[in-house]
Swiss-Prot record:
Tyrosine kinase of the non-receptor type, phosphorylates the marelle protein. Required maternally for the establishment of the normal array of embryonic segments: involved in the control of pair-rule gene transcription in a stripe-specific manner. Together with Hsp83 and piwi, mediates canalization, also known as developmental robustness, likely via epigenetic silencing of existing genetic variants and suppression of transposon-induced new genetic variation. Residues 16-41 have a biased composition (Polar residues). This is Tyrosine-protein kinase hopscotch. It catalyses: L-tyrosyl-[protein] + ATP = O-phospho-L-tyrosyl-[protein] + ADP + H(+). Its EC number is 2.7.10.2. ATP binds at I898, G899, R900, G901, H902, Y903, G904, T905, V906, K926. One of its GO terms (biological process) is blastoderm segmentation. It is a peripheral membrane protein. Pfam families: PK_Tyr_Ser-Thr (PF07714), SH2_1 (PF21990). CDD domains: PTK_Jak_rpt1, PTKc_Jak_rpt2, SH2_Jak_family. Belongs to the protein kinase superfamily. Tyr protein kinase family. JAK subfamily. Residues 1-41, 1158-1177 are annotated as: Disordered.
């Protein structure tokens, strides 16, 4: 039966393989406008009719087919990749031009497991908008980008995009129509061009309302512009790209769905006139302009919320009265918006809606069906869930399908959100214990995470073809009984036909009845098989299409006030989601048991993140002592002390403190000797208030001194200098260096001073002395003998200060603090009186401060990275921040490690720019494991900064303090993994094109006089570009520039990859471009063996054995299915005499000549993206 393929009445254009655009225009603008078509769409012939935007016709399907089956068939027919299938859906089709503004438009979507109604007509549409639509969609799936153009064109002509409607956007609509005409003109065959002129059919490309209003004027203008652009037009592919680009930017809510329902309450709603908020916080409430009719809006009320729906099949619920509920709009704000999540807004006729966050999308873990029109959402943070009542059953189903698929495409691809409406394909994958199209690299990671046992396997769907599966199975144990022992993973192709599985294995095909049989027929070193099933917690990057590749930075000038931060009670932080860490700022505190680091407290609401200082307990510290410190500090409620915002209760145990922009006071004053007297008096005023707070609350601090006061504000123009008292730190004994801050009577028993509440008044006096002496002298270097000698001279432990820098009343206060009579040491009344007297007597005399460096954690000695681990806690999954320049910083998660080598580890992260209009950019961060190879690090930076070639990985930034290099991120990952896991789908033409990529990149390096010294598949990355792939050379850690003779002589023998090295490089450490050519030959072996290890046969027993056999003439065997000319090229690369090997320029010529200059990437059913001409913009 031909129903599933659209029947045999399709109009096929022999030259283009589709109905011509002009014919489609005629169909959509005349037949559909009147509610009919050439196929009599309202005639019920017992089939399901689905409109196809690509052909402009209705496809017919058997009525027993489920919605998901029809979607699958349409995707196959249109060449849409399996990974993109969930972006599409089936919706009821509008055959009217434009509904009356008083009529409720009800175009609902079908659930995947639902059967469609023969009485209705439907359309196949892209439903979900991927982030950065105009650029990312083409990279995900080129065919989807082409389909979107057809869909947008149809929606423009039928005026279904509210944001680009006449009359507001007359010029934009006209411009898009001209672009449409240019595309259609280029896609016509010569015969079609002879039969009709696109220029004369211009009215078919215009929205009808525009044509009716301006038919007299617009015709001549469009024809004139069309003729002008046609003479120098871009290619069809670039025109389509610009069309999609224009529409996506003019209509930012295109493919955004908005629902209407009734709820019982609005969480976090701000109630007017001081009646308080409903819910817990106002932080999630935000205002935004509502587009009253967003594209493809579902169940959106325009003016009358009780209007009757068109095509109103489906059960209806009586709309509750206002007293029984609240009518709201519901919308999912996507992950690339500033405040993503599920939001609601009261239905109102006002132009501005108040959108209120119900919950993060990833926090919605279930939808329960209450009845035919009502659901309850189970959401993290809402203990009793959140009920929604829709007007019809169809609306409810549309909402369930939208939210369920959105969550699959953003967080949990293997999960059905509503168990009342199951997805058939998910149930089948679950019953087969099979993964979706997760890709080979993610499969390898899963095998590693699950122990990497021999016999472990994963079965996954192919991400390029339908009905094709792969099995990734660990078959061999390599390097047994050594510290390098690991499993070899092999990948085999499986074709599914009905209920049977056809396995390609050992040069034959085996037809089997189950995947269990498939796993057991493949030979492995272990008889056992361990199947690794899919999990709802899997996060394969290939499938999470709605997660933005480049997140937008939080664009806001709003920030929490100091008063608001002071009011908040300390909280428990999740170190993974609430905090960002700056590992470059790490330092060891004076107590020796805690590390200090700068950080950011991430704010979920639309305000700036809060800068914080984090104090982390060392792994050998006592948690109870840490907890007692945090408990004491959490009770302090005074602005004179650094605020404790909260703490983490997971390793590393951390106190999250108020941030000090200028660091400790002693360092600040030492670097700012000209701080004026007024500023110092202002500073002292705050310190006196802090001491009074300690006295009133009977708190013994024990560490009052300038090094423990942190400067938070300095504004000489306003005469402000604020410093706050920090916590005393981890308990530790007093040392002799603490003597200036301890009463002399305790010099023989320093520890006894810790229980004396008057002892900190002595410390207060010494601290005032430090302040007014501008910390010129480090008092901690003074010995007790010196202090006692000075006290015997004039009664004070330190010399008197000159009255020019310290007024007499201030030094009188200092002497009171050093008095042996404890009752005279501190009187805040007397001190405030003295301060006021001094301020009244002197005039403000401020000098402009010199520029100073800011350091959030102070200037404590930064520890050499070789003395401690990279971080003072085990590998974790916290967000790390490294400042790069004044313009940007890099943020990464240690959990996102994507590679590890001898000298470094590579993480995935993103660049965040200070310019909030510039989106975040995904990058790879290569971080050295040890500082002992810092010379290599600087050399690698110096080399990478000079390189610019399409087959060389792009260098972006570097951070010397962190010893890390920031490079472009290539999602397809390492070439050696790609070879193994894409092996069944890798044909020789594709491999030859990769060989040419590498040769071109190496020719560029060779021309620059650069020797790579580590060329291998593991150091090559794969770049997925649209529907094609190319490769780029990376890892220049061993690279060197050659001398005038073309050689580089290594000075030391370190761990070297001998199986890729030429004999002269192994034996004499002499490297040249010719030794790179040898490595290129070995890399060719890796490629055409589909990822095999380059071992001699029989395998070498040692490095010496390997070298001896190479020198005796042995070479790697020819890989199976390797073309003759490629193995001949390998043999040339492995010539014993270096200068007899071909140069890379010669290699490029050999490959190009062999394939007659027509080496292209195979399409596997997909077309490569177009090349943009230089004059395209």
């Amino acid at each position: 039966m031909a129903l599933a393929n659209g029947g045999e009445d399709r109009m096929d254009d022999s030259s283009s393989g589709r109905t011509s655009l002009a014919d489609s225009a005629s169909l959509t603008n005349s037949s559909l406008r009147s509610g009919t078509s050439s196929q009599s769409i309202h005639t019920n012939d017992g089939t399901i009719r689905v409109f196809n935007f690509t052909t402009g016709e209705f496809e017919r399907f058997h009525p027993n087919m489920l919605c998901e089956e029809i979607c699958n068939t349409m995707c196959r027919q249109l060449g849409i990749a399996p990974i993109a299938q969930l972006l599409y859906g089936i919706r009821e089709h509008s055959t009217s031009r434009r509904p009356s503004p008083l009529v409720r438009l009800d175009l609902t979507w079908c659930l995947p497991g639902e059967r469609l109604n023969c009485q209705l007509v439907y359309c196949f549409r892209m439903r979900f908008r991927v982030p950065e639509l105009d650029s990312q969609l083409e990279l995900i799936d080129g065919r989807s980008h082409k389909f979107l153009y057809r869909q947008m064109r149809y929606d423009m002509r039928t005026e279904q995009i509210p944001e680009i409607r006449y009359p507001e956007h007359k010029d934009k609509s006209t411009g898009l129509a001209v672009m449409d005409m240019l595309i259609d003109d280029q896609e016509q065959s010569e015969d079609q061009q002879a039969m009709r002129s696109i220029e004369k059919l211009y009215k078919l490309y215009l929205p009808p309302s525009l044509w009716r209003a301006h038919s007299f004027f617009v015709g001549s203008k469009i024809r004139e512009v069309f003729r002008s652009l046609k003479a120098n037009s871009l290619s069809v592919e670039r025109l389509k790209w610009h069309y999609v680009h224009q529409v996506s930017h003019l209509a930012p809510t295109y493919m955004t769905e908005q629902f209407t329902c009734t709820v019982q309450y609005l969480p976090n709603e701000e109630v007017a006139r001081g009646s308080g908020p409903i819910g817990t916080s106002l932080a999630h409430s935000t205002s935004t302009l509502a587009s009253s009719g967003s594209t493809n809006t579902l169940s959106t009320l325009t003016t009358n919320t009780n209007s009757v729906a068109l095509g109103g099949s489906g059960k209806k619920a009586k709309r509750r009265s206002t007293s029984g509920g609240i009518d709201v709009y519901v919308r999912v704000f996507p992950h690339d918006s500033l405040e993503p999540g599920l939001k609601v807004a009261r239905v109102t006729s006002e132009a501005t809606l108040k959108w209120i966050l119900v919950g993060a999308v990833e926090g919605i873990f279930m939808i329960s069906k209450i009845n035919d029109t009502s659901v309850r959402l189970e959401i993290v943070g809402l203990p009793k869930g959140y009920e929604m009542q829709f007007q019809t059953e169809k609306e409810m189903k549309s909402f369930i399908s939208y939210l369920g698929i959105y969550i699959r495409l953003s967080s949990k691809w293997m999960q059905d959100l509503c168990h009342s409406y199951r997805t058939p394909s998910l149930e089948e994958l679950s019953s087969l214990h099979c993964h979706g199209p997760i890709g080979g690299a993610y499969s390898l990671m899963k095998l590693h995470e699950n122990g990497d046992k021999c016999g472990s396997y994963i079965v996954r769907e192919c991400d390029r073809e339908y009905n094709i599966y792969y099995i990734d199975i660990n078959t061999k144990i390599m390097a047994k009984k050594t510290d390098q022992e690991r499993c070899k993973t092999e990948t085999f192709r499986i074709v599914r036909k009905d209920s049977q599985w056809k396995l390609s294995y050992n040069n034959g095909e085996h037809v089997l009845n189950s995947l269990h049989e498939v796993a057991h027929i493949i030979q492995a070193d272990s008889p056992d098989r361990y199947r690794i099933p899919a999990s709802k917690y899997d996060k394969p990057p290939l499938l999470l299409l709605l997660l933005p590749k480049n997140l937008k930075a939080k664009k806001t000038d709003l920030q929490l006030s100091e008063a608001e931060l002071q009011r908040r009670n300390p909280q428990i932080f999740n170190p993974r989601t609430d905090l960002q860490w700056y590992p470059d700022s790490i330092s060891l505190s004076d107590d020796g048991m805690m590390f200090t680091m700068r950080g950011d407290w991430i704010q979920q609401s639309p305000v700036k993140d809060v800068s914080v200082t984090m104090k982390m307990l060392k792994s050998d510290g006592n948690f109870m002592e840490f907890f007692r410190l945090a408990q004491t500090w959490s009770l302090i409620q005074s602005p004179q002390f650094l605020k404790l915002y909260g703490l983490t209760l997971a390793d590393p145990y951390t106190m999250v403190m108020e941030y000090s922009r200028y660091g400790p006071l002693n360092k600040f004053l030492h670097s700012m000797p000209n701080v004026t007297l007024h500023c110092l008096l202002d500073l002292m005023h705050g310190l006196v208030r802090g001491m009074h707070y300690l006295e009133d609350n009977k708190i013994i601090h024990n560490y009052i001194r300038c090094s423990n006061l942190y400067v938070t504000k300095y504004d000489p123009n306003s005469y402000v200098l604020d410093a706050k008292i920090s916590d005393p730190g981890y308990p530790r004994p007093y040392r002799e260096s603490d003597s200036p801050w301890i009463p002399v009577k305790y010099y023989r028993n320093l520890q006894a001073a810790k229980t004396d509440q008057f002892a900190q008044l002595w410390a207060f006096a010494t601290t005032i002395y430090e302040i007014f002496s501008r910390c010129k002298e480090d008092l901690s270097t003074l010995r007790q003998e010196q202090l006692l000698r000075q006290k015997n001279l004039d009664g004070n432990i330190l010399k008197m200060l000159d009255q020019d820098i310290c007024p007499a009343p201030i030094f009188e206060t200092i002497m009171d603090g050093w008095s042996d009579d404890e009752t005279k040491r501190f009187s805040h009344h007397d001190i405030f009186s003295r301060l006021n007297t001094i301020k009244a007597e002197i005039l403000p005399n401020y000098m402009p401060p010199p520029e100073i460096a800011t350091n959030g954690t102070g200037d404590e000695t930064v520890i050499d990275r070789s003395d401690i681990p990279f971080l003072p806690f085990p590998r974790s999954n916290m967000l790390m921040v490294i400042p790069l320049t004044s313009e940007c910083r890099v943020i990464y998660n240690m959990e996102n490690m994507i590679g590890r080598g001898h000298y470094g580890t590579v993480y995935k992260g993103h660049l965040e720019f200070n310019d909030k209009d510039q989106p975040r950019e995904q990058v790879a961060i290569k971080m050295l494991n040890t500082m002992q190879v810092s010379t290599d690090f600087h050399r690698e930076i110096g080399i990478m900064r000079t390189l610019s070639h399409p087959n060389i990985v792009k260098f972006k930034y570097w951070a010397e303090k962190s010893h890390c290099i920031i490079m472009e991120y290539l999602q397809s990952g390492s070439f050696d993994i790609y070879l193994r896991f894409t092996a069944p789908n890798l044909n020789n033409p594709r491999l030859v094109s990769f060989a040419l990529d590498i040769a071109n990149g190496m020719k560029y390096l060779s021309d620059m006089g650069l020797i790579h010294r580590d060329l291998a598949a593991r150091n090559i990355l794969v770049d997925h570009n649209g529907d094609g792939d190319c490769v780029k050379i990376s890892d220049f850690g061993l690279a060197q520039f050659a001398n005038s003779d073309g050689y580089y002589y290594a000075k030391s023998k370190r761990d070297i990859p001998i199986r890729w090295y030429s004999p002269e490089a192994i034996s004499t450490c002499r490297f040249s471009s010719y030794s790179d050519v040898w490595s290129y030959g070995v890399t060719l072996f890796e490629m055409f063996s589909r990822g095999e290890e380059p071992n001699l046969v029989p395998i070498q027993t040692s490095q010496e054995d390997f070298l001896n056999r190479l020198q005796s003439g042995e070479r790697l065997n020819r890989p199976a299915s390797c073309p003759d000319f490629i193995y001949d090229l390998m043999q040339l690369c492995w010539h014993a005499t270096p200068r007899s090997r071909p140069s890379f320029a010669t290699i490029v010529d050999i490959i190009t000549r062999e394939v007659a200059t027509k080496v292209t990437h195979p399409t596997d059913g997909h077309q490569s993206p177009p090349n943009q001409p230089t004059d395209a913009e």
